Structure formats: C-alpha cells, structure tokens
C-alpha cells in the first residue's frame, strides 16, 4: 500500500504530515506504530513528529500531533503552524482559521509575505500546580545536578514545560533535562527549556518529551519561556525567542499569548508502507 505525505518544518522542528481530511488513511490503533516507523531517521522519512489533518465538527479542521515515539500530545506550536499553512494552501480553510486540538480550539492567521508566516493564538499560559501538572509547587523549585544548583519554573502552554534560566547555554543540556523530564514531581513528564535572557531577546534550547532529545525549535516551549520570564520581571510583553532553528516572535497580553513564526513545506512524496520497519 502507498500513501501520500508531506514533509514540513517550523524552524527546523520537522514533521511528516498525513492528510486525512477526506477520510482515515492510518487506523487509530495503527497510528502510534506507524508514527514510530515513519519518523525513524534511518529507516523512515525521518521527523520529530507526525501531523494528521482531519475534519472537525467544532472548527474548520482538526489537528492531531504524535511525537516520534508514537505518543500523542495535546499541542505542538511549530507543528500547528505547519499544519495551518498546509490546510490553507490546500483550500480546506481560509487564511483566518479555527483549529480543533486536544488543548482546545485555537485561532490562527496565515500570511504569505516573503514566505509563509503563521500567527497562533496559543491561549493563556497556565501556572497552577494542577494545571501543569506537578505534585508540588515548582515555581522556583531547586534542582541539584553535577554539583550545581538550578531553579526551575513551570507552565503549561498546551503541554507542560519547565524553564531553567542560565548565564550560558554552552553545555550539554541532555543529562539535566532528562533528570527533570523524568522527575516524579511531574506525573506526566515535562518538556525542559534552558534559556538565556538578554533584554527582550531570549535564546532557548529545548529537550522535548516524546522526542527524548534536543530539537532545533519548540513553539510551545518558546511561549512558556517567554511567559515565565515576563512573570519573573525579566522581560517585557513582546519577546524575540531565538532557537537553533530560527526566530519566533511572542506577544503576551492579559488574556492570551501569540506566537508568530514561519512554516516550510519542503517536499511531497509517497510512502510504501510495506517497506517501513516496524520492529525498531
């Protein structure tokens, strides 16, 4: 069996997109297994995750996102920008659209000005212990690693995120990130961001839950870091977030957070399902 796919990325955070707007292509029970196979960088197409375009009874379209390990997540900031560009380009929705996600219905605007740009109303960041969720108050919680002490702060921007503010990002973030990601404090696990603030510019490196490694960019993480930094009085309400993959612009208001960034459609192709490796 052969199925069509599209390869996209938002600031280097890359995805395989499957269009199920006209009907189911990959059965629900098969989706985790399929995603693990197609996202494998040696035996599949290779990606940080997979996007599924589906019809919605509540909005213009329905967004589904799976991490490369096959787990489904409520939201992905870079993913929803790519998704939105695709559905506008294919004529499934207009340039102002409403998208159903597991994190709620989001409003977006797609613009074509020197490339494709998508502005996402990400909703209001949540800081409550039960909203993150966390077993204890983690606002300023101290973590010790390799003889050093770090303070962590958490927010939920569709998925849980921890921010660790540092003076330098020139170190291997993975060991400490994994310690925090798998801490019993976070019953659902968490994404972990390391951030360096310079005025209203924040440089961020993110370890993503479900990918289980550092990615080139994370949209929900960028929003979370900006919201936490603003709450701590480190930045203003408009912030440039610099990731390894590129720039995201974050704007915070009393009621919501807006994220603006690019969305690239790299190529379209055909998958031969019988050639994928499902045993890895």
Swiss-Prot record:
Site (Could be important to modulate the pK values of the two catalytic cysteine residues) location in chain: 161, 208
EC number: 5.1.1.7
Catalytic activity: (2S,6S)-2,6-diaminopimelate = meso-2,6-diaminopimelate
GO molecular function list: diaminopimelate epimerase activity
Any matching Pfam family: DAP_epimerase
Pathway linked to the protein: Amino-acid biosynthesis; L-lysine biosynthesis via DAP pathway; DL-2,6-diaminopimelate from LL-2,6-diaminopimelate: step 1/1
Binding of substrate, residues: 13, 67, 77-78, 191, 208-209, 219-220
UniProt keyword annotations, A-Z: Amino-acid biosynthesis, Cytoplasm, Isomerase, Lysine biosynthesis
Protein known as: Diaminopimelate epimerase
Naturally occurring in which organism (per UniProt): Archaeoglobus fulgidus (strain ATCC 49558 / DSM 4304 / JCM 9628 / NBRC 100126 / VC-16)
